[in-house]
């Protein structure tokens, strides 16, 4: 378990213990249909306080492979689905909140550098037996892990659009950010699912699309 790789399930457990909890686990069945398909890129655009983060926490708890979370889901709607046990606790999960990284740094370059370094640290600590080809490359590190495990990643990104909201006029920063997302996620066989949440709808920014 790392801070960003296969994080603990405490946030979802907290939701389950809440006095008011609405079972949204039916979403998992829909997402299971997309894992490792050409439709594996999902973006959920909703206003704040719409339960986007809770849903991402639920997906992280369901897919993460280093913890038995079956007791959390056995009484929920997803337990009735045919795909329930097929995907339960079967994947390496990367769970990040882009707003946290942006808030803790001073510019886009620093944000991306910190993100890369933290993810690489989690991955290389979890798979210390692997001989990594490029220890400073996030993409190559994930390729090396995938080649070793044969298990694709479930990547959950909260507040993916925060940079566009805070750097509305900085087109160069927006371009570099989209270039990073594209290089990291698009056409990579280590991606089993890329699930992103935000406020703004995905659209084309200048000559660049988000993915």
Where are each of the predicted segments found?
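Phosphate-binding site recognition
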Residues: 1-211
């Amino acid at each position: 378990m790392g801070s960003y790789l296969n994080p603990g399930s405490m946030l979802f457990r907290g939701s389950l213990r809440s006095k008011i909890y609405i079972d949204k686990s039916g979403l998992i069945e829909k997402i299971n249909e997309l894992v490792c398909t050409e439709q594996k890129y999902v973006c959920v655009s909703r206003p704040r306080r719409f339960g986007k983060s809770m849903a991402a926490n639920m997906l992280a708890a369901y897919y993460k492979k280093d913890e038995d979370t079956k007791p959390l889901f056995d009484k929920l709607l997803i337990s009735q689905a045919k795909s329930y046990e097929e995907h339960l606790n079967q994947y390496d999960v990367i769970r990040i909140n882009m707003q946290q990284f942006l808030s803790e740094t001073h510019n886009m370059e620093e944000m991306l550098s910190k993100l890369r370094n933290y993810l690489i640290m989690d991955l290389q600590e979890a798979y210390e037996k692997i001989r990594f080809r490029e220890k400073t490359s996030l993409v190559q590190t994930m390729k090396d892990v995938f080649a070793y495990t044969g298990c694709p990643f479930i990547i959950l990104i909260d507040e993916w659009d925060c940079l566009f909201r805070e750097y509305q006029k900085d087109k160069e920063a927006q371009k570099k950010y989209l270039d990073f997302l594209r290089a990291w996620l698009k056409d990579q066989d280590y991606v089993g699912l890329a699930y992103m949440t935000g406020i703004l709808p995905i659209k084309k920014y200048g000559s660049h699309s988000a993915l």
